[in-house]
């Protein structure tokens, strides 16, 4: 599968007198239809990277290719039309008096016909389960509902790429999981490419690959399973240790023959059943 995003030796500084570059020769690619999670401590360069991809910042050196086109000043708006951004605080994105108005805002700015706007708005709200709230004021919604509306606004623009910048971090665990599942369903149905900056294990577990950033560089890329198998190293990367990994570690320390590495809850359940049956 071809790459829809590619960064080649990208370097960026916010200030000329910085001791270390904010990004230092960053190179990676994202495949069409892939879900890539980007993790790392604060200051590792995660948010800077996605702002460069969206053309909100300009690299000092290196190149960024989006959907086959080199990102430049002349085509930055064309590139942005291919990308939907959802941020940590949805209140910063709302501009409409009602949910329906807000989702329609970007479409109206593109000069899309009224009937097409109505159809796209209704479809996007249906995808995120918010069609019954379209006459509501965004300020009166819960945190999870606000993020669903923000996602609907992005999806209505029919982007090829959706970027989530800590989009689930302000939600409670239930709301976070529901939102992640909604994003997964939309991604699967429409073959969208998803880039997610996150510290949430459930979000990371659903991704195809995980890119770890450290001190403005790419520390590693791996599958979620390979990442979770790193055990205590996860704490140094800004993640918790998955519950199943902690259980596996405890069993191994007690001498039980459990497979090393990350297991899903179902896989761990199967292993425990096998152990019990042999006792």
From Swiss-Prot:
Q: What is its main location?
A: membrane
Primary enzyme class: translocase
Q: Which residues form the ABC transporter domain?
A: 5-240
* Record keywords: ATP-binding, Cell membrane, Membrane, Nucleotide-binding, Translocase, Transport
Its annotated compartments are:
Cell membrane
**Membrane topology term:** Peripheral membrane protein
Pfam families assigned: ABC_tran
For this protein, the Enzyme Commission number is: 7.-.-.-
Checking SUPFAM superfamilies in the record gives: P-loop containing nucleoside triphosphate hydrolases
Briefly, what is this protein's role? ATP-binding (A) component of a common energy-coupling factor (ECF) ABC-transporter complex. Unlike classic ABC transporters this ECF transporter provides the energy necessary to transport a number of different substrates.
Q: What is this protein called?
A: Energy-coupling factor transporter ATP-binding protein EcfA1
The organism is: Streptococcus pyogenes serotype M1
């Amino acid at each position: 599968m071809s790459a829809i995003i590619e960064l080649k030796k990208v370097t960026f500084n916010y200030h000329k007198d910085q001791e270390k570059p904010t990004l230092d020769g960053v190179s990676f690619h994202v495949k069409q239809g892939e879900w890539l999670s980007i993790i790392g401590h604060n200051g590792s360069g995660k948010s800077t990277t996605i702002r460069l991809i969206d053309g909100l910042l300009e690299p000092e050196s290196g190149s960024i290719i989006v959907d086959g086109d080199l990102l430049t000043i002349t085509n930055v708006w064309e590139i942005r039309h291919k990308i939907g951004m959802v941020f940590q605080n949805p209140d910063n994105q709302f501009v409409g008096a009602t949910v329906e108005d807000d989702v329609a805002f970007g479409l109206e700015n593109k000069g899309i016909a009224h009937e097409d706007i109505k159809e796209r708005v209704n479809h996007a709200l249906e995808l995120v389960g918010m069609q019954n709230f379209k006459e509501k004021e965004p300020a009166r919604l819960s945190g999870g509902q606000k993020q669903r509306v923000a996602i609907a606004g992005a999806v209505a623009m029919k982007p090829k790429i959706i970027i989530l910048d800590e989009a689930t971090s302000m939600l409670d665990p239930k709301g976070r999981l529901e939102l992640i599942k909604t994003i997964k369903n939309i991604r699967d149905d429409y073959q969208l490419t998803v880039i997610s900056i996150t510290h949430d294990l459930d979000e990371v577990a659903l991704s195809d690959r995980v890119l770890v950033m450290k001190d403005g560089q790419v520390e590693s890329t791996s599958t979620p399973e390979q990442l979770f198998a790193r055990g205590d190293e996860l704490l140094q990367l800004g993640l918790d240790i998955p519950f199943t990994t902690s259980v596996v570690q405890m069993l191994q320390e007690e001498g039980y023959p459990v497979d090393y590495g990350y297991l899903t809850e179902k896989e761990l359940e199967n292993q425990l059943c096998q152990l019990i049956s042999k006792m």
